[in-house]
Every structure is written in C-alpha cells, then in structure tokens.
UniProtKB/Swiss-Prot annotation:
Recorded topology in the membrane: Peripheral membrane protein
Organism (species): Caenorhabditis elegans
Basic and acidic residues composition bias: residue spans: 22-33
Cellular location(s): Cytoplasm, Cytoskeleton, Microtubule organizing center, Centrosome; Membrane; Cytoplasm, Cytoskeleton
Name of the protein in its database record: Probable dynactin subunit 2
Length: 331
C-alpha cells in the first residue's frame, strides 16, 4: 500500500493505455485520513532556514522500494540581489549576497577567459575575498560584531608597485633639491642594508662578536705556545712542501686513473683472448702432426701395395705365359 492508502499498480509494456479516472478526493478537513496539527512558526523557521525544497531526486510513487526520501537540502541557496533600478536602501545582507554573486561571476569569467587574469585579479584573490564575505555573513547571522582577523593575502605586486612609486617620488625630490649624488640602489636594498647596520650596532650582537674574537685569539695563542714548546724542526716546511707536491702528483694520477684502469682492463681482455687463441693454435698443431703421421703411414702403405702389386702382376704374367705355352703344345 502507498503512503496515501492506495494500491501500487505496475503495468507491463503491452498493457492497454487506458487510464481509469480516479475519484476526486474529499478535501473536507473532517475526513478521517486528514490529521490536523499545529505548527510552531519560529521552530519551523529555525529548522528549515536557508533550505530549498528539491524533488528532483525523490520518488514518492513507489512505497515498496526502501528509499530515503529527503526532499529538503541545503546544497542550493538563493541570493537576494537588488537591481540597478531599486530605489530603496540596500541592507547589509543584500550587499554581502551581491558581493558573493559578483565574485562568483568573476570566477566564471576568469575560468572562461585566461587573458582576464592579472596580478591583482586572480582565483587566489577572489577566494580570499569570498572567505572574508562568508566570515562577515557568519558574524552577522550570529549577531556579533567581532572583528575579522583574517587579512586578504594580495600578491607582492601591490607592494612592489608601492615601492616603485616611492622610489619615483624620492628620485623627483632628489632632483628638485639638487642632490650631488643620486643613489642607484633600490629602496628595498637600502632598507635591508640599514637593518643589517642597525643589527651590528646592537649591544648583544657586538658582545657576541667580541666573545668570538676573544676565543679565536686564545686559540691562536695556544697554537703559538704549542709550536714554541714542541721545537718544530726546520725541515718540517720542506717535508710539508714535499707532501704537497706528492699530493699534487697524486691528484694528476687520480685524474688519469679511470682511463688507466680502462686500459688495464682492455689489456687483460686482450691477454685472455691471446691465451685462448694460443690454446686453439696448439690444438691445431697437434692435429696437424697427427695428420702428417697418418699421411706418411698412408704413403708407406701405398708404396708397399705398389711393390706387392708389381710382384703379383709379374707372377700372373709368367703364369699366363706358361698357360699360353701349354695351350700351344696342346694344339
């Protein structure tokens, strides 16, 4: 059943599109389904202040699905802005709302066109200004006239422009008065120099410098005493010079050390390749000796085979001659 006491009807796509005419509801306040309540206007104003009735994401037709139906939200706000033709006096709240609206409009214009950005008009300055206005609105809503301690953080270009104007005025005054020496250093550098000089004139700073100088003097005196007590050799300077020369030579050697190491590594690799080549060459030499021995043995065998063949051929020829003689005798 729905919240108003009627059934939920779900129709398929193929159902007929005939809509039954619903009976007009009885708007009689004495109807048993109507509950009469009393509403406190002040409490309702406190509860629903700055809230807007938004039904875009709410669905009251379905009572089966368990959904949270919150129609009131504070994600939207209404700005009370008076137009140019408004003849009445503009209140403080309306002025603050108008400033917020103009700041939002400026933000949109800057986002749409980057060329509108300047050193005095950018997203950071507008954000700080919006924070200021919101703090003022909060203070006004709370009924307090507290002083806002937050300062709008403007870029350094404004101070630089002020310094530039101050420098120009000083230059004009110096030119009008007729100063003999016109300084070329900027005012900020001159101020920093004066600050440093004033700090050097500070009693605590001067006393600290005096303590450091006294400590250095005592250390130097101790070093002189140790040198006098130890009777340093005259040859110490020569030894120090020799060590210095050795260190200089070592610096040169250190500078050429990586290239020398690379050369040694290359020679080592070449030596390994030579050893490998020598092993292969000795192996080939042994193979050659074996082949020469086998060739010599083959030649000897061929010579023996030729001599034996000649003997056999001679014996065969003699036997053929004997056979021919016997055949001739038989004829």
């Amino acid at each position: 059943m729905s919240s108003i006491g009627k059934e939920d009807i779900y129709e398929s796509d193929g159902a007929a599109s005939q809509v039954q005419k619903s009976e007009p509801e009885n708007d009689n306040p004495t109807h048993p389904d109507i509950e009469l309540i009393s509403v406190d206007v002040d409490e309702a104003l406190k509860k629903y202040k700055n809230r807007v009735l938004n039904l875009t994401s709410s669905d009251f037709s379905d009572s089966i699905a368990k959904k949270r139906r919150h129609a009131f939200g504070n994600n939207q706000y209404v700005l009370e802005v008076t137009g140019a033709g408004f003849s009445g006096t503009e209140t403080a709240a309306e002025k603050l709302n108008r400033i917020l609206y103009e700041v939002a409009d400026l933000n949109e214009q800057i986002r749409a066109d980057e060329n509108l950005k300047t050193d005095l008009l950018n997203a950071e300055v507008l954000e700080n200004l919006e924070k200021e206005v919101k703090t003022l609105q909060v203070a006004q809503s709370n009924g307090k006239t507290a002083r806002v301690e937050h300062d709008v953080e403007l870029p350094n270009v404004r101070t630089d422009s002020k310094v530039a104007t101050l420098e120009n005025r000083l230059r004009r005054i110096e030119q009008v008065i007729g100063s003999s020496v016109i300084p070329s250093a900027p005012v900020l550098d001159t101020i920093e120099d004066l600050k440093l000089r004033c700090e050097t004139l500070n009693h605590s700073y001067v006393s600290g410098l005096e303590q450091r100088l006294n400590m250095m003097l005592t250390k130097l005196e101790k070093i002189d005493e140790t040198r006098a007590n130890n009777d340093i050799d005259e040859n110490l300077d020569k030894k120090v010079d020799e060590i210095l020369e050795l260190m200089q030579k070592w610096d040169v050697a250190c500078s050429s050390l990586p290239s020398n190491v690379n050369k040694v590594k290359a020679l080592n690799r070449l030596h390994e390749q030579v050893q490998h080549f020598a092993g292969g060459l000795s192996h080939l030499k042994t193979i050659r000796e074996k082949l020469e021995k086998e060739v010599a043995q083959g030649r000897e065998a061929i010579i023996e085979y030729e001599s034996q063949g000649k003997q056999e051929i001679g014996s065969v020829v003699e036997k053929l001659k004997l056979l021919e003689a016997k055949v001739a005798d038989l004829k």
